[in-house]
Amino acid sequence: MVCLFENLMNMIKYSIYILPLIILIVLSISIKKDVQRVHIIIQSLKLTLIVIMIVIGIEESIYVKLNGHLIKTELIKLFEYLLLGVSYMIIKMFEEGVTEGKKTKITDEGLILIYSSIIGMLISMEAHNLITLFLSLEISSICFYILALNKNSRKGIEGGLKYYIIGGIATTILLLGIVSIYKSTGSLMYTDLLVIVMENTDDYRIQMGIALIVLGLILKLGIAPFHGWLIDVYEGAGMLMTFYLTITQKLVTLMVLINLYQNLIIYTNAIMFTNGLIILILVTLVVGTIGSLRQQKLIRFIAYSAIVNSALLILMLAGSMSEELMVNSVYYLINYIIGLTVLMSLIMGFLRLNDRGTIEDIYQLKNMWVINMFGAIVYILVLMYLAGLPPMTNFISKILILLPYMVLGRVYLTMLAFFLSVGVMIYYMNLVKIIIIDKVQTHEQGVAELEITSKPTKGGRRIVLGVMWLIFSQLYLDEILNVIKVIVALI
């Protein structure tokens, strides 16, 4: 009887992903009116995400399912909550765009693809088998290729094709690494590989396979020098889709790398892996900082900023994955997600141009201080937070990430990261100068007038809650870090 009940519960857990997808497809076919169809699908998708979060919350802390192919820990549950929360906010922003008739409108096919990518990413985080990891990553990647392809824009088509080509190369490298490990060990399960790797720490085929898998994941993440395609993809995909791709890719890739490190990499020649990773991190920090300093388009600046933040997030892998580094990195990731969410809410729901378009170029921020001082102050606070200026919370989270490397003896890495952070701050301060000081001259052509709204139903709540976190969360820093530490200790 107990076994029957467990099987029934497992069927419910597995079907919670598939049944909503079938329902969404049926709704997209059966409802004829476009606006009504998209609205119903959005509401169904929001409800589905809430149900999935509830199911994840009532699951056991640590358990294995599907005969060891998937595993769930408290850290994985935290990352899944972050993924579902970000996805819910993205769907909400798309809903606001559909309601107001903005350029952020999305089709029913796009919503189904977003949900399909969420399924793939959830499975990727829980994957405890290399072939399961590969297939789940491909599910989300195929959806990303189509979502990034904006057929109404030349840059969107170009970026989508680049994403597809680079994604294919990354997939090939990833699959080659899996084949190399399977040829050497005869298994794809993490538990089996763990025993074999501990007995054969110097097997070059295992080391090469792990290196290829990590390289494929880094290529998908856009770490320098494999970053050029990422900028064009984000510019063509649009602001909201850039937000979705930026956050979700970081969450999934970081969780997959953590799983790989704890189950495989830590028992191999970790020194070689660490040295190679440090070189990539240093190159990424330099390229991301220099690239962001010369950007005039807001979305390209966000893309370069995302590259820098990716380097800071994978720093914990170069620090032997100590508990302190993991806790601080997760805290930094949460701060980054909240800061970027507030920035996107400002751009999409609070700041817009009078022609009902969204802000795309930096110069369009001119006169904001004159038009609406309150909106300008909020925008400046968010920019200062993302720049990591004291006393903002993001400054503390950066300090928490970098200082442990002083103890580990990697002073050069810490000092270079601090130096490059100052370079990024200079650009953020230039944005503040544009908002407060610069004024639109009468002879400038093509400068649309900025309109600032303060409707609480259009992103206002997200902005208020986000700004409160940016300013006041440091008052409860010890409590927040202790909660994260408990979660990390349970993996």
From Swiss-Prot:
Keywords: Electron transport, Membrane, Mitochondrion, Mitochondrion inner membrane, NAD, Respiratory chain, Translocase, Transmembrane, Transmembrane helix, Transport, Ubiquinone. The chain crosses the membrane at residues 11-31, 38-58, 74-94, 106-126, 129-149, 161-181, 210-230, 238-258, 270-290, 298-318, 330-350, 375-395, 411-433, 463-483. Its EC number is 7.1.1.2. It is a multi-pass membrane protein. Pfam families: Proton_antipo_M. GO terms for cellular component: mitochondrial inner membrane. It is found in: Mitochondrion inner membrane. It is an enzyme of class 7 (translocase). It catalyses: a ubiquinone + NADH + 5 H(+)(in) = a ubiquinol + NAD(+) + 4 H(+)(out). InterPro entries: ND/Mrp_TM. GO terms for molecular function: NADH dehydrogenase (ubiquinone) activity. Belongs to the complex I subunit 2 family. Core subunit of the mitochondrial membrane respiratory chain NADH dehydrogenase (Complex I) that is believed to belong to the minimal assembly required for catalysis. Complex I functions in the transfer of electrons from NADH to the respiratory chain. The immediate electron acceptor for the enzyme is believed to be ubiquinone. This is NADH-ubiquinone oxidoreductase chain 2. It comes from Dictyostelium citrinum (Slime mold).
